[in-house]
């Protein structure tokens, strides 16, 4: 078997493991979103554990691109955060979440279309790629990652018009005796997005730190369970 694969037995074993993982993914039922809606050329799909934003156009993602989701530039996507909000109680309970943008994609390599997750709102929490998120060739996907809000944590920079809602939500959680409901509902995702179309977004506060893309997106070889380091796969 080793002679049939370049690189010897180790490459052969890695190839068999990759084929087995792909066969399991094909058997996994397709997860359907709870809600989906369009904003311009972007399709937003809200799943129980994550939100997917897809643009089926082939884009050149740079700081001047006007077809990005609500965010001033690609470099700022990685540290941009929507207001804290409470999901539908029948689906998620009364937990509060914070979300952060992350984009990733490559046209010539299918493996690189798999999303990499960055968790800004909970430093000790390890975000995982949703098992049902399948790479699609020649599509650009943006993922919103959310996690339970940590009370007392220093908030990330917010757009000016949503910072007030974020502070109010955190304040009512920390100090419910100050009045109003303990679980004050902040603006929900569709309403907030409807006010901030791509290309017409508020600037982030001056001095807000934005992590360089090269420092945030990990190389493909560093992801556990995704095959051999440096191994390339071309789209079928």
Curated annotation (Swiss-Prot):
InterPro entries: Herpes_Orf11 (IPR006882). Keywords: Host-virus interaction, Inhibition of host innate immune response by virus, Interferon antiviral system evasion, Viral immunoevasion. GO terms for biological process: symbiont-mediated suppression of host innate immune response. It holds the Pfam family Herpes_ORF11. One of its GO terms (molecular function) is identical protein binding. Belongs to the epstein-barr virus LF2 family. Prevents the establishment of cellular antiviral state by blocking the cellular IRF7-mediated innate immunity. May also inhibit viral replication by modulating BRLF1 activity. Interacts with host IRF7; this interaction inhibits IRF7 dimerization, thereby altering its function in immunity. Interacts with BRLF1; this interaction modulates BRLF1 function. This is Protein LF2. It comes from Epstein-Barr virus (strain GD1) (HHV-4).
């Amino acid at each position: 078997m080793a002679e049939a694969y370049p690189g010897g037995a180790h490459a052969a074993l890695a190839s068999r493991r990759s084929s087995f993982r792909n066969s399991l993914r094909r058997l996994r039922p397709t997860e359907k979103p709870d809600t989906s809606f369009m904003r311009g050329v972007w399709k937003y799909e809200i799943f129980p554990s994550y939100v997917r934003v897809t643009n089926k156009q082939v884009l050149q993602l740079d700081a001047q691109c006007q077809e990005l989701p609500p965010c001033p530039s690609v470099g700022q996507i990685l540290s941009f955060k929507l207001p804290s909000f409470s999901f539908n109680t029948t689906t998620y309970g009364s937990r509060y979440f914070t979300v952060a943008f992350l984009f990733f994609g490559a046209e010539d390599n299918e493996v690189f279309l798999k999303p990499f997750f960055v968790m800004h709102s909970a430093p000790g929490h390890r975000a995982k790629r949703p098992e049902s998120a399948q790479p699609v060739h020649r599509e650009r996907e943006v993922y919103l990652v959310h996690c339970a809000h940590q009370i007392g944590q220093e908030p990330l920079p917010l757009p000016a018009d949503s910072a007030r809602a974020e502070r109010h939500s955190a304040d009512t959680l920390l100090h419910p005796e100050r009045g109003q409901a303990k679980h004050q509902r902040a603006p929900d995702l569709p309403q907030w997005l409807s006010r901030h179309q791509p290309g017409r977004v508020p600037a982030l506060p001056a001095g807000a730190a934005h992590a360089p893309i090269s420092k945030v997106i990990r190389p493909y070889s560093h992801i556990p369970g995704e095959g051999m380091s440096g191994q390339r796969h071309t789209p079928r």
